């Protein structure tokens, strides 16, 4: 049984809790949004070549929301893509008024730009592949068939979100629940059969999430009402075996609101997937999970990838802002000498100044940001962009 303490039974609030990971206050960003915000701090001025995430339907979910951007390419159906690619125009995100209206305008323009930017890329990947499995006519199956084509077509996006509704079974649950689980089973089976044809079934992990579970008793209408302790299911050939993880909630032990008592926190599941499937650095996971500590569950996955910010490896380029005594330093590990530039931007992409334009010798470098810029910087968040050896690297930092 997966959930969180004092389960909220509102569809909207609990959906936000599962998307944001914050259950004691209203957090405006999602857990994947925070990851992509950390990964692409200069998203508005230097977006990646492929969409960070693809979301089909369920557009109100904040799971991919950052502070200033939504990082998912979101569509109702893939047939819309060609029209967007042919008719889209880009919007200015620099000359924005400094007010509440400007904040909203920036968000809308950035989201629209992302859609137009990636439409052709997604269309090309979609048309480069075909399906090799029978998905049936169900909505979930059709969504997964599109995802399979994007993966097989070489899009390169790592996170996809699809949806299956109608689990709010206040009435006629036995028949409806069986139909839904059969749809889920058939769709997942077809999806992995399709991926297996291209040898990709062990490289894709599927996971279900829902805002809550159901009560442990019938409600008088042949259904059940909103409850706690929902199941989370994982799928994929990359899982080491299959089975039940954790303890099943005691069917005879309820909380004060007549709910089953969860035995696993949903953020433990997130932490486990981020650690052992996506192989993220612990400091990044800490940001994603709002600086809270959670357990790692034995889900049958194990990471084999090294951290991307390992300063002990002298053969890898690394960079990180370090805060000491009210001063911000940019520390870099340069594996081979080369000329490079480092430029500082504000959050809407305006260039603030050049931090460095020089030959960087092999080894460790530490640069005082304020001293290098040579002018007063207002308190707040900024983005630095390193150009070195034909590559570009970015990260956000705080001026305090």
Where are these regions (language model features)?
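Feature for exported/extracytoplasmic and membrane-associated proteins, marking the mature portion
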Residues: 1-187, 193-197, 217, 231-238, ...
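Short, glycine-anchored, charge-dense loop/turn motifs used at functional sites
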Residues: 345-352, 382
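Phosphate-handling catalytic cores of nucleic-acid transaction enzymes
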Residues: 227
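Metal-dependent active-site segment of extracytoplasmic phospho-/sulfohydrolases and closely related
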Residues: 188, 194-220
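Residue-level detector of functionally pivotal "anchor" positions at catalytic/ligand-binding pockets or at interdomain
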Residues: 301-325, 333-335
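C-terminal tail/sorting-segment detector
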Residues: 354, 359-362, 370, 375-400
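Short beta-strand/loop motifs in extracellular/secreted proteins, especially
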Residues: 338-341
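Non-cytosolic beta-sheet module surface loops
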Residues: 331-336, 346, 386-388
